């Protein structure tokens, strides 16, 4: 009898997860296990968290029992989530170096945590690496190291865990910010590895890199190229952000939706694409813009309702 209930619950989850969900990155400083309830209370149906301090390469690992309970809370509140890996992970360092090995340990720790959380976790998002000058590497060598890092982390973690590669903003020495670079990484993996690697499209980042997504035409062009070179079915989620800086600025500064340089026409087109392909939208917006109608800083509820109206 218990088995039938579990199968039924799983079937319902599969059906419900095949629709576009809306949410945002949330802070877990007020409690880790209570984070799903908090996310639900503010209106999220999907959310993102760091498991530890984002600027620390090796935060203390979460306890097994709290990770399992966290997963139960996701089921209770009908939520999907994704873990964002430490900002300091850099797989472009030479394999065997202390910084490379520490990056692997950090990523493996988070992947193992998602295994305990369960199948309502989309995986672990990591940034593109940086080809820092002290390593004296070519860009291709740095990308080769990045591929080695992915392969290494996958080989040390359960087969049901997933790495999600986030598009970069071309800041500084960041590699593979363009679709060609992402494809170079992806197609260096074998079939089994590719099954465990997905992508997160950050709208602010691709705008900063030089993809003009301010119009439906530009949005269609970007996703058409991505589909041709990688496949849109490999997009796990979209970091849905406007940008405070101009096209091809190579500067990563998120803006609230419709209060930045990308604007409503492009953002609406992205929401429409997400709905068509059932891709989840996760906002990382600063919520610092002033609503001219209220003369107050905008709230997540305002952004949520805005995006929800675009998905109708």
UniProtKB/Swiss-Prot annotation:
* GO MF term set: deoxyribonuclease IV (phage-T4-induced) activity; DNA binding; DNA-(apurinic or apyrimidinic site) endonuclease activity; phosphoric diester hydrolase activity; zinc ion binding
Q: Does the keyword Ligase apply?
A: no
Keywords from UniProt, A to Z, are: DNA damage, DNA repair, Endonuclease, Hydrolase, Metal-binding, Nuclease, Zinc
Domain of life of the native organism: Viruses
Annotated Pfam families = AP_endonuc_2
Q: Which reaction does it catalyse?
A: Endonucleolytic cleavage to 5'-phosphooligonucleotide end-products
What is the cofactor note?
A: Binds 3 Zn(2+) ions.
Residue sites binding Zn(2+) 1 per the record = 84, 127, 166
Instruction: Tell me the InterPro entries matching this sequence.
Output: AP_endonuc_2, AP_endonuc_F2_Zn_BS, Xyl_isomerase-like_sf, Xyl_isomerase-like_TIM-brl
Positions that bind Zn(2+) 2:
166, 202, 239, 284
Record GO biological process: base-excision repair
Cofactor(s), by name? Zn(2+)
| EC number(s) given by UniProt | 3.1.21.2
**What does this gene product do?**
Endonuclease IV plays a role in DNA repair. It cleaves phosphodiester bonds at apurinic or apyrimidinic sites (AP sites) to produce new 5'-ends that are base-free deoxyribose 5-phosphate residues.
Name the family.
Belongs to the AP endonuclease 2 family.
The record ties this protein, via NCBIfam families, to: nfo (TIGR00587)
This one is known as: Putative endonuclease 4
Q: Which organism is it from?
A: Acanthamoeba polyphaga mimivirus
Lineage at the top is: Viruses, Varidnaviria, Bamfordvirae, Nucleocytoviricota, Megaviricetes
């Amino acid at each position: 009898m218990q088995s039938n209930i579990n199968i039924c619950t799983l079937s319902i989850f599969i059906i419900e997860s095949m629709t576009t969900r809306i949410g945002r990155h949330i802070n877990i400083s007020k409690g880790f296990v209570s984070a799903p309830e908090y996310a639900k209370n503010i209106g999220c149906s999907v959310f993102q968290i760091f498991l530890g301090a984002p600027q620390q390469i090796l935060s203390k690992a979460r306890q097994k029992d709290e990770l399992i309970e966290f997963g139960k809370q996701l089921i209770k509140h009908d939520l999907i989530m994704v873990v964002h890996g430490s900002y300091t992970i850099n797989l472009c360092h030479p394999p065997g170096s202390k910084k490379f090995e520490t990056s692997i340990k950090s990523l493996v720790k988070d992947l193992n945590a998602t295994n305990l959380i369960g199948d309502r976790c989309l995986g672990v998002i990591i940034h593109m690496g940086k080809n820092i000058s002290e390593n004296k590497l070519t860009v291709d060598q740095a990308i080769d190291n990045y591929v080695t890092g992915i392969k290494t982390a996958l080989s040390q973690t359960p087969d049901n865990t997933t790495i999600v590669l986030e598009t970069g903003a071309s800041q500084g020495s960041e590699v593979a910010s363009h679709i060609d670079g992402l494809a170079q990484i992806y197609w260096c993996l074998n079939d089994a590895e590719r099954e465990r690697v997905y992508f997160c499209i950050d709208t602010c980042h691709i705008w900063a890199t030089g993809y003009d997504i301010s119009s439906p035409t530009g949005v269609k062009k970007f996703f058409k190229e991505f589909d041709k070179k990688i496949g849109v079915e490999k997009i796990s989620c979209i970091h849905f952000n406007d940008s405070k800086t101009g096209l091809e600025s190579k500067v990563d500064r998120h803006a609230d939706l419709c209060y930045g340089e990308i604007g409503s026409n492009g953002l609406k087109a992205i929401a429409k694409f997400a709905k068509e392909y059932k891709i989840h939208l996760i906002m990382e917006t600063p919520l610092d813009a002033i609503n001219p109608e209220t003369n107050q800083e905008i709230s997540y509820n305002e952004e949520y309702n805005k995006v929800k109206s675009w998905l109708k």
